[in-house]
Design a protein with these regions (language model features):
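GHKL-family ATPase ATP-binding module
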Residues: 1-321
């Protein structure tokens, strides 16, 4: 509840070409009784983020605390103004990276009252994705339906282009979403009339209709951009295919190690007289009938590369059977 009466000051004069409204607020010391400390870095990051999300808006951040004043007593001040909006945001995040394509892919459209704005750029020296999602200027750190829609349309669209351009055969398996998003920096901002957030912290968007809207609008704009920029789609697909091949090679290596570990650690048949050589190319396995034959075979074998396995029952001649 407010304490004290509202105080107004002279407002800007429209005749002098000044417009706008000034709103001031201070935390209630009766509620925040432990202490009030404003963290400059936190506030600066959030205001810069808002300036990126609302291109053309000028935000002035002034720290009037005594500790922040310069030698002449002037407060520390920063101005955030980004006419390019989230396109400049992506450029800012990629300034230390090697962009795969100089032009940032930009989407700005609206459907069923939902506004969708997205900026995307792949980098050759990055091997993971960096996707920032926002809903009504709120950072959705846990993702949500808008991020799901973006990931889905990226995977579908680029796989379609890969088949269309002959980069992948029809019989080949599709590129995984992680392969396609490798090196991607993206900012996705949606404006939803009636947002539904999961949890009190509003970190995940839950509107189911947003998934399809993002899929539709981003897919249309992305396909159009790639159609007119064949060199860009070629570079993106080349990186995605390299990521796919690397993932497949890593998977095969893991399976080989696991299979080898299983063979080395698993219990061998009790009556098997194994050989010492571990290379299957150089080894032989003799299957004999009964323990008596097994004993005779063990006496005459070369332990280095010959293994003996006695079994019960008569061996079937499979070729004749």
């Amino acid at each position: 509840a407010p304490i004290g009466s509202l105080v107004s000051e002279p407002q800007p004069s429209e005749e002098a070409g000044e417009t706008g409204t000034t709103v001031c607020f201070k935390p209630d010391i009766e509620i925040f009784s432990i202490g009030i400390v404003f963290d400059y870095a936190t506030l600066s990051a959030r205001l810069r983020e808002l300036a990126y999300l609302n291109g053309g808006v000028r935000i002035v951040f002034r720290d009037e605390r005594e500790s922040a004043r310069d030698a002449e007593g002037n407060p520390h001040e920063e101005i955030y103004f980004y006419e390019g909006g989230i396109k400049e945001y992506v450029a800012y995040m990629n300034k230390e990276k090697d962009a795969l394509h100089p032009e940032i892919i930009y989407v700005n459209s609206e459907k069923d009252g939902v506004q969708v704005e997205a900026a995307l750029q792949w980098c050759s020296d990055a091997y993971s994705d960096s996707i920032l999602g926002f809903a009504n200027n709120i950072r959705t750190v846990d993702g949500g339906t808008h991020i799901e829609g973006l990931k889905t349309v990226l995977t579908r669209t680029l796989n379609a282009f890969a088949k269309k351009l002959g980069k992948r055969k029809e019989s080949d398996s599709n590129l995984a979403g992680e392969n396609i998003r490798e090196g991607l920096t993206a900012v996705l901002s949606v404006k939803v009339p009636e947002p539904e957030f999961e949890g009190q912290t509003k970190t995940k968007l839950g509107n189911t209709e947003v998934r399809g809207i993002v899929d539709n609008l981003v897919g249309e704009a992305l396909s159009q951009f790639l159609e007119f920029n064949p060199s860009v789609i070629g570079l993106i697909l080349e990186k995605a295919i390299q990521a796919f091949n690397a993932a497949e090679a890593a998977r095969r290596a893991r399976e080989l190690v696991r299979r080898k570990s299983v063979l080395e650690s698993s219990t061998l048949p009790g009556k098997l007289a194994d050989c010492s050589d571990r290379d299957p190319v150089n080894t032989e396995l003799y299957i004999v009938e009964g323990d008596s034959a097994g004993g005779s075979a063990k006496q005459g074998r070369d332990r280095k590369f010959q293994a003996i396995l006695p079994i019960r029952g008569k061996l079937i001649n499979v070729e004749k059977a």
